[in-house]
């Protein structure tokens, strides 16, 4: 059984088709990185999963039940946008109000539990308006965790956060899936951060799923390149470009060679052209680079 199974999902807004036969499978216990450019259909899919909008057609099952099933809905938590909180209320009072509205038994105990999960026990008395962006995002996750959900839908939870905020968010997601029987679907444009936590990926383009894979498959799919660093960057790049098909300079002043070649061959070739190499290494392309390659292959950005 999977946490989510979507088949042939469509959604129309007037004449505009936002989802065009989307298929999606999210394994139980995974952190599923949901990736796509703006307007690709990510948010529409997440809103359908959360019951905020209805699909035009297709089948959506959550834990093998229809996504509209009341038992399913009670075991889901969603953070689709900045949480709607009373700005002059404390963090504690905002969460208590939500817990009472959800008819949660022992609301005080539940609020204490979710505050601990999102690393905010010490900020319970803070007014919402005085909280940082990262804290507000964590308050939203705390609200979504009320009721002990098995599935969490997070739309762009790390965008705009500083380094420490992103680290805390990563730790929270890993803790929830590892220790609290939770499956997470998380969308983000910060692919470098997503790559650090995701166990599975789904890449969507123009309302269709173009690739789903486990993190292990991504690791195997990412092509290897050789990177060299030499004193004369432009000369090095020019010499390498005369022999190899794809040679690029990265942001760290390494020259990358994507052809199938060994580091020893590169060093020897440059030495024969009077260029001494300061450093040479092999590496694999990142999730972001893989995504860009895939979009180019499919005719996207």
Language-model features: locations:
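ABC-family P-loop ATPase nucleotide-binding domain
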Residues: 1-10, 297-301
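ABC transporter nucleotide-binding domains
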Residues: 4, 11-186, 191-205, 209-211
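Surface-exposed charge patches
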Residues: 97, 113, 238, 268, ...
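Glycine-centered loop/turn motif at secondary-structure junctions
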Residues: 103, 119, 243-244, 274
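Residue-level detector of short coil/turn "hinge" positions at structural boundaries
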Residues: 106, 122, 247, 271, ...
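Residue-level "edge-of-site" marker
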Residues: 128, 252, 283
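ABC transporter nucleotide-binding domain
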Residues: 170-258
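C-terminal coupling/interaction segments
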Residues: 258-301
């Amino acid at each position: 059984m999977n946490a989510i199974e979507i088949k042939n999902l469509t959604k129309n807004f007037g004449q505009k088709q936002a989802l065009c036969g989307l298929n999606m499978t999210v394994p139980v216990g995974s952190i599923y990185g949901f990736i796509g450019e703006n307007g690709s259909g990510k948010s529409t899919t997440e809103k359908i999963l959360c019951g905020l909008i209805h699909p035009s057609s297709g089948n959506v099952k959550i834990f093998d039940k229809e996504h509209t099933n009341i038992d399913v809905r009670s075991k889901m938590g969603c953070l689709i946008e900045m949480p709607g909180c009373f700005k002059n209320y404390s963090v504690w009072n905002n969460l208590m109000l939500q817990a009472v509205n959800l008819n949660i038994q022992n609301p005080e105990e539940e609020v204490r539990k979710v505050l601990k999960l999102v690393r905010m026990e010490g900020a319970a008395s803070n007014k919402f308006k005085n909280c940082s962006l990262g804290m507000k995002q964590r308050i939203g996750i705390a609200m979504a965790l009320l009721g002990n959900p098995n599935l969490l839908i997070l739309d762009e939870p790390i965008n705009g956060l500083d380094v420490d905020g992103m680290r805390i968010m990563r730790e929270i997601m890993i803790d929830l899936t590892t220790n609290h029987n939770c499956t997470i679907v998380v969308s983000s444009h910060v692919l470098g951060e997503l790559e650090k936590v995701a166990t599975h990926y789904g890449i969507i383009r123009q309302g269709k799923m173009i690739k789903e894979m486990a993190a292990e498959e991504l690791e195997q799919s990412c092509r290897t390149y050789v990177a060299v660093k030499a004193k004369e960057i432009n000369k090095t790049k020019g010499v390498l470009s005369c022999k190899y098909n794809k040679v690029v300079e990265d942001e760290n002043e390494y020259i990358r060679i994507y052809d199938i070649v060994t580091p020893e061959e590169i060093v020897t070739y440059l030495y024969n052209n009077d260029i001494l190499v300061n450093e040479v290494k092999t590496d694999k392309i990142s999730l972001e680079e893989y995504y860009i390659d895939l979009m180019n292959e499919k005719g996207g950005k």
